[in-house]
Regions:
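Conserved N-terminal diphosphate/IPP-binding helix and adjacent helical/loop segment
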Residues: 2-166, 214-249, 372, 392-398
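Acidic, Mg2+-coordinating active-site segments of isoprenoid diphosphate-utilizing enzymes
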Residues: 24-42, 112-121, 146-167, 185, ...
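Hydrophobic packing residues in well-ordered alpha-helices of helical domains and bundles
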Residues: 67, 71, 131-134, 197-200, ...
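Generic structural signal for well-ordered, non-transmembrane alpha-helical segments
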Residues: 72, 142, 178, 182, ...
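A short glycine-threonine-serine/GTX helix/turn-capping micro-motif
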Residues: 171, 250-262
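Post-HExxH zinc-binding segment in Zn-dependent metallohydrolases
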Residues: 173-183, 187
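Transmembrane helix-loop-helix
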Residues: 185-204
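Short, amphipathic C-terminal "tail helix"
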Residues: 377, 384-398
Length: 398
């Protein structure tokens, strides 16, 4: 009976509890994982509803670039990697089969935001066409970056017949990622708007910097900073003002900085550029940027929590639950230090069990809730209509 009552108290996955300290220490591993497993949500249904609002099917498979001969040729080469464990195949699977939990619908959010405001001009149809193009190129840039991150480091001294598929996969990842980024930049130039070009280019700069932020292992996988005492959790979304020494080792600051650099600023700048194309004032543009960043951070926190509570699989060592656990129990950093050369050497099951014994899960839920509420507050400042209501559904359903 005591077990049942504990389970009922933890039944809601994203409604954080008032008490932060963990009450899970007395449970077994299996009991903890059952309690934390997120419930099924009809995400695909919400996506279809949102696409009806914008009047456009926004999945990546519908992007016009996929109809080109160049992409078709690359897809043929990509098929040769079927059955291999190359990282580029995992990314391709997420894109082609619509794994929305790994690839959130950023383009759809930008289009919904575009529909939420009235364009102060008679040529609203042409503006919305530009905003749709902006949504597409934002998705392409993000996907191209993810594919480039799928490159596997194969030291020259270790190359042999067994590594041939890795080397071939790297060539495909480079070509495919380059194609998407070049096509996206061509579409961006086609908008013929210098201000939009500057805003989106700022996000591309952030994506590049994300690959050099903090320590990395031999495969360029991120390693968290050594835990430090935190006196202030506040951090700006203006990436030019973020200093690595000021955030590394400080759980929320480090997580926010890494996540913003690693793509969230692209979503924020995409939302900002959408308002710029829609002839909105600077205040509305700033609201849109803040909204986009908070949406991206909320979704990332939710995705990381779901990844952690899966029964199997490797999770990111710089995810929010890990960083919060290190804050609560700095001794856990010894487990990570032992795998500094290759993060795969970490005993993830043992690390997961130790994480779940801290208050990291509660804090990650609070992190999601905090950014979701802030995102809704910013979108309320922009508009009140069907598009805004649909954005709120997307935030809450994820």
């Amino acid at each position: 009976m005591a077990y049942v009552s504990r389970a009922l108290r933890r039944a809601s996955p994203f409604l954080f509890q008032k008490r932060l300290e963990s009450t899970m220490a007395s449970l077994t591993k299996d009991e903890i994982l059952i309690l934390l497993r997120p419930p099924y949500t009809n995400w695909s249904h919400i996506i279809r509803e949102a696409e009806k609002v914008v009047g456009y099917p926004t999945s990546f498979m519908n992007l016009r670039c996929l109809l080109s001969d160049e992409f078709a040729n690359l897809a043929l080469y990509l098929r040769k990697l079927v059955g291999s464990n190359h990282l580029v195949m995992k990314t391709a699977k997420n894109v082609l089969y619509g794994d929305s939990k790994n690839l959130q619908p950023w383009g759809l959010v930008i289009l919904l935001l575009s529909k939420s405001v009235k364009t102060p001009t008679l040529n609203s149809k042409a503006i919305y066409e530009q905003q749709r193009q902006l949504a597409e190129l934002t998705e392409m840039m993000r996907t191209g970056h993810l594919i480039h991150r799928g490159i596997v480091n194969v030291p020259f001294a270790k190359r042999s017949k067994s590594t041939e598929s890795d080397i071939f996969g790297n060539k495909i990842a480079i070509l495919l990622g380059d194609y998407l980024l070049v096509t996206a930049n061509s579409m961006l130039a086609g908008l013929k708007n210098a201000d939009v070009l500057y805003v989106v280019s700022t996000a591309l700069k952030d994506l590049s910097e994300s690959e050099f932020f903090g320590e990395r292992d031999e495969q360029n996988m991120p390693i968290p900073g050594k835990p430090k005492v935190v006196n202030d959790d506040n951090i700006t979304f203006e990436t030019n003002c973020i200093e690595a020494n000021d955030v590394l080792g400080k759980s929320r600051k480090e997580w926010t900085a890494r996540t913003v650099f690693n793509g969230v600023s692209l979503l924020g700048r995409g939302c900002q550029a959408s308002m710029l194309l829609g002839k909105q004032n600077r205040e509305t543009q700033n609201f849109a940027y803040q909204f986009g960043c908070h949406v991206g951070l909320a979704w990332q926190a939710a995705a990381e929590l779901q990844k952690l509570t899966d029964n199997k699989g490797q999770f990111c060592l710089t995810s929010a639950p890990v960083l919060y656990a290190l804050e609560g129990n700095p001794d856990l950093y010894k487990i990570i230090e032992q795998a500094r050369n290759d993060v795969k050497d970490v005993d993830y099951e043992d690390l997961k069990f130790n994480i779940l014994k801290t208050d990291a899960v509660d804090k990650t839920k609070m992190l999601y809730e905090d950014h979701a509420k802030k995102a809704m507050a910013y979108i309320d400042n922009i508009g009140q209509n069907e598009s805004v209501d649909m954005i709120k559904k997307l935030i809450n359903t994820f």
